[in-house]
Amino acid sequence: MKNTSSSTTLTMNDTIAAIATPLGKGAISIIKISGHNALNILKQLTQKQDFTPRYAYVCDIFSDGVLLDKALVIYFKAPYSFTGEDVCEIQCHGSPLLAQNILQACLNLGARLAKAGEFSKKAFLNHKMDLSEIEASVQLILCEDESVLNALARQLKGELKIFIEEARNNLLKLLASSEVLIDYSEEDIPSDFLKEVSFNLEKQIASFKDLLDFSNAQKQRNKGHALSIVGKPNAGKSSLLNAMLLEERALVSDIKGTTRDTIEEVIELKGHKVRLIDTAGIRESADEIERLGIEKSLKSLENCDIILGVFDLSKPLEKEDFNLMDTLNRTKKPCIVVLNKNDLAPKLELEILKSYLKIPYSILETNTLNSKACLKDLSQKISEFFPKLDTQNKLLLTSLAQTTALENAITELQNAKSHLDTLELFSYHILSAIENLNLLTRPYETSQMLDSMFSEFCLGK
């Protein structure tokens, strides 16, 4: 049978190296080396023997005696480094070929090519970062939403870890109290014990739910708000899309049915990611391809968050307009009614349109041919439908694993609250909640914490 523990230990003892900067040409590339042999490799690369930790040196870089580059190098002595091991950084000129050659020189001198995320894994296993900080560092790299940056930076600093540890300590105190009362059942349970425990549980559950609700809302925001542009043929849908993109993305033509499929683009409006979906004109059509496009248009309405219903202000309402309004009413989605072509004499019966619509809506008169003015007006209207999230001083769950662990912890605390009259069951659910919280930061043996916690309690407390 394979010894997994031994294999992991051998792998963790390896000295690893990798290029830390993205592929491509730039001002600099960074090669990182981590492990017990990192300093020795750096000495051989530079033909220099003395390095003071945390000092930057400009050194020639050699491979088999051949000069490769003049680079900036820094040595971080264990345990005062990102991984907790000896770490060396080589900041060379930003040629991909040069960086690869220096990396290959590191490998020739005994380093192993690092696996994806292995530097962070070393940091975690060497207790330099916990799971929540690892998650935050990944999401910070991937983040496209400015409003989330502060929450991720605070999580990287360790604020989520502090929040979870405080909650865990509170639950351990409750668990210790209940265990004492179980072991000494002849002692009378204090009359205010159950009331105090119930209050503390409610308070803890509420704080967890607040974190969970904010994280779920932010997750939806990160996906982007889906905005479908619908209307009858030639109402100006594609012109509207082009105006919002400030480019000719969709084909504009006087011929009905030009747009036969949905076109999707992503833009940013007032700090929010918006997925724009231009749809085929909604009408009755005998053309099979156009009909399939119309079906996709209707499907997009089911999955979108906001609808832009485009009407031609220069023409009276027609059957296709009323069919569109029937469709909008069925979706029950918030809608911005865009009255296009306001540069022409208005003929659309606005009061009839207002009375016909039964959904939340706002009205915007515009001219899609004036792209900048149209975009400015639309941005303001669309932003009114965005949910207002207060991101200041908020913590954030950044993965499905974290969300699931907290959801399970909440369920266990609710179960504990419903079993206050049976301390054995109460203790079981509190312990399960603690074990789920462990998954958010760092798993450890709860019994060790309990031993420490129990030592602070006296009989009757």
Curated annotation (Swiss-Prot):
tRNA processing in keyword set: yes
CDD domains the UniProt entry points to: trmE, TrmE_N
Compartment(s): Cytoplasm
Enzyme Commission number: 3.6.-.-
Cofactor (UniProt): K(+)
Top-level taxon: Bacteria
Record-linked Pfam families: MMR_HSR1, MnmE_helical, TrmE_N
Residues that bind (6S)-5-formyl-5,6,7,8-tetrahydrofolate: K32, E89, K128, K461
Binding site for Mg(2+): S238, T259
Binding residue positions for K(+): N234, S253, I255, T258
Record's function text: Exhibits a very high intrinsic GTPase hydrolysis rate. Involved in the addition of a carboxymethylaminomethyl (cmnm) group at the wobble position (U34) of certain tRNAs, forming tRNA-cmnm(5)s(2)U34.
Descriptive protein name: tRNA modification GTPase MnmE
